[in-house]
Amino acid sequence: MILASLLTFATAALAFDCSDKELERYNFESIKGVHSYTTLKNTPPSQTNVTWNVGICQPISAIKDCPANSDICGVTSILRKDEKPVVSEVVSFKSDLQKAYESSDNGIKVIYKGANWGDVLVNAELNFQCDKDSQNNEFTLDQWDGTNLKLSMKTKAACITSKEDKKKEKHDNGESWGWFTWIFIFLVLFLSIYIIGGAWFQYNKGNAIDFQSALKEVVENFIELLKGLPSFGKEIIEKFTGRSNRGEYSAV
């Protein structure tokens, strides 16, 4: 069943945030970061480079010519041979600009309106289209006329996703092995303390000629203890099983 499109205006002035309730149905965490789209045009005697940067679930902060805390930032540079690039235009949609979300089964649009740019107000629309087979996660420029900016991206992140699927898609960062690692470390430490401490105790009691002999004796005792564990466990199981069977017999 196809859901009707919903248009929801953000009530709080926040950055493009993966935790926003309007984005909960999607998995933008999987494409979190700053994405860029660049066009290069020959404008003799120079070239004009226009780069649009979009911060998904994090503001733009590391790009030199972009204002801090921008969600979207466009930088136009004039390139001339043997000369440093000259920045001619910077268009910024700040993180505190109010946004609107237009969502559907086919994806979601994030809409920015009324960003100040010189004497005019400019608008932007990020159109994320659901494509379960897409691996590129790259923006394309649909429109920029000096007033309205439209960028689109075909991505799996824009497909409606359950919480269970989000957990499955998260990359293993090694945390799942943390407990096993710590248990192994503590076990090694415990055995080391047991063996060395036991050897030191035997040596101090005078039961061994030297510390090395005491250490060897403790290790041998420990090995014998390990060998006896299976039979000890078997005996415990047989006792419980035997009691259970006798109990059933008595009940009959």
Curated annotation (Swiss-Prot):
One of its GO terms (biological process) is protein transport. Glycans are attached at N49. SUPFAM superfamilies: Mannose 6-phosphate receptor domain. GO terms for cellular component: cytoplasmic vesicle membrane; Golgi membrane; mitochondrial membrane; phagophore assembly site membrane. Residues 198-252 are cytoplasmic. Induction: Expression is induced during biofilm formation. Residues 1-15 form the signal peptide. Its main location: membrane. Keywords: Autophagy, Cytoplasmic vesicle, Disulfide bond, Glycoprotein, Golgi apparatus, Membrane, Mitochondrion, Protein transport, Signal, Transmembrane, Transmembrane helix, Transport. Disruption phenotype: Reduces the formation of biofilms. Significantly decreases the resistance of biofilms to fluconazole, itraconazole, terbinafine and caspofungin. Leads to autophagosomes with shrunken membranes with undefined edges. Also results in partially dissolved contents of autophagosomes. It comes from the Eukaryota. Residues 16-161 form the MRH domain. Residues 16-176 are lumenal. It is found in: Cytoplasmic vesicle membrane; Golgi apparatus membrane; Mitochondrion membrane; Preautophagosomal structure membrane. Disulfide bonds join C18-C57, C66-C73, C130-C159. The chain crosses the membrane at residues 177-197. Plays a key role in autophagy. Effector of VPS34 phosphatidylinositol 3-phosphate kinase signaling. Regulates the cytoplasm to vacuole transport (Cvt) vesicle formation. Plays a role in ATG protein retrieval from the pre-autophagosomal structure (PAS) and is especially required for autophagy-dependent cycling of ATG9. Finally, plays an important role in biofilm formation and resistance to antifungal compounds such as fluconazole, itraconazole, terbinafine and caspofungin. PANTHER family: AUTOPHAGY-RELATED PROTEIN 27, MANNOSE-6-PHOSPHATE RECEPTOR FAMILY MEMBER. Belongs to the ATG27 family. This is Autophagy-related protein 27. The gene is ATG27.
